[in-house]
Amino acid sequence: MATIGALLLRFFFIAVLMSSQKSWAIKEEHTIIQAEFYLLPDKRGEYMFDFDGDEIFHVDIEKSETIWRLEEFAKFASFEAQGALANIAVDKANLDVMKKRSNNTPDANVAPEVTVLSRSPVNLGEPNILVCFIDKFSPPVVNVTWLRNGQPVTEGVSETVFLPRDDHLFRKFHYLTFLPSTDDFYDCEVDHWGLEEPLRKHWEFEEKTLLPETKENVVCALGLFVGLVGIVVGIILIMKGIKKRNVVERRQGAL
């Protein structure tokens, strides 16, 4: 899906160094990232804060609302969404200028890597969550579709915003709540400007192969037998060593 697009991306890094009060030696290093972008031809932007790789909050541009990743965060801090909207407006204006100066050269497309896994160990009949992890891609635009038995699923789905990486690429998580069953299989289909065709990752329940009881007994018996043989051989070698030493001592005494 090769689509020409333009992207203005700004990263601001704030390093927070935590030091020990006793030794004044630096023990840990944390990073807060303010990431914002405006994208064409989608005509959309994003504004978010990240702490050590985890989202703190982002601003819903359409609703002019600050969305905290965890509700508890809002009890300790606040952020006015209007500030983010002002930044996005500046990004849009700057992008228009940069497009003209660069002769409308589009940003390079980097195709994503996609992984599908369950959030927790899967047990039949127990609710769980499938995670579609989309990583190492640019620009920040993807279309994601969950499929169950080949059919699109729209209920029980959620997603994160685009999360920045240290290498200026992006990552994103999509989630699907599901009830594990041997009759169902799932796919996460990802479309991106860097892909020639949508990339689909498959997941289905796989029963754990348990070792039959008879084989377990054979393995245990074999292990016990090998252990006993080792003990017997060890005792024989020790006894031979003692006898050999006694013979040598007697000969030396006779001399």
Swiss-Prot record:
Where do the record's region annotations for Alpha-2 lie? 110-203
Q: What organism is listed for this UniProt entry?
A: Mus musculus (Mouse)
- Protein name per its UniProtKB record: H-2 class II histocompatibility antigen, E-U alpha chain
User: What SUPFAM superfamilies does its record include?
Assistant: Immunoglobulin, MHC antigen-recognition domain
Which keywords label this protein?
A: Adaptive immunity, Disulfide bond, Glycoprotein, Immunity, Immunoglobulin domain, Membrane, MHC II, Signal, Transmembrane, Transmembrane helix
Q: Which cysteines are joined by disulfide bonds?
A: C132-C188
Pfam families, A to Z? C1-set (PF07654), MHC_II_alpha (PF00993)
Instruction: Name where it's found.
Output: Membrane
Region of interest called Alpha-1, as start-end residue ranges on this chain: 26-109
Region entry Connecting peptide: which residue ranges? 204-216
Residue ranges annotated as Extracellular topological domain = 26-217
Cytoplasmic-side positions: 239-255
UniProt lists the family membership as follows: Belongs to the MHC class II family.
Q: Which domain of life is it from?
A: Eukaryota
